[in-house]
Amino acid sequence: AMPTRQIEKMIEVMQGLDDRFELDLMLVPTFPGYLEKLKAKSGTDRRIRFIPPVSMEELVPFSNAYDIGLYLLPPTNFNYAMALPNKFFEFIQARLAVAIGPSPEMARIVRQFDCGIVADDFAPATLARALNSLTAADVDRMKAGSEKAAHVYTAENNAEKVREIVTSVLKEF
């Protein structure tokens, strides 16, 4: 868990959600002090749990038991503004509905496949309002959208593109 990713914003989202929602955070304690800060921020809210990490091989199958993958990454720098993080694709491969802020690259995929919701801004309360408006049918539809996206965004489908890019770059040297 890196402080620059502002995971506390996801805890703030929970503070605006109704009782249907729970948040399980699976964090590697890279910065133990930060993890303790997050636990303190979650307070006594029983809907927020810190669960032990699983291996990379287990991550997608484990995550499939959930309904929604939440990822709110404020655009504090160019890389975060244009991010397509592994976590986002893990959610899609797990066939989850995705709930994000308006990060342009993630939002493009979410809208293209109708695999989640995109908040109007990066305020936790805005994403909470969007999540509270969802019905079970909405979530099921979005999970079906992730199923479609998961078949497009695979290593196998993108391997040839990566080879072409690497070959092109190497030719320049």
Please report, for each region that a protein language model flagged, where it lies by residue:
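C-terminal alpha-helical cap of glycosyltransferases
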Residues: 133-136, 155-173
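A short, well-ordered alpha-helix in the C-terminal region of glycosyltransferases
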Residues: 140-153, 164
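Conserved donor-binding/catalytic loop of nucleotide-activated donor transferases
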Residues: 64-67, 88-97, 113, 119
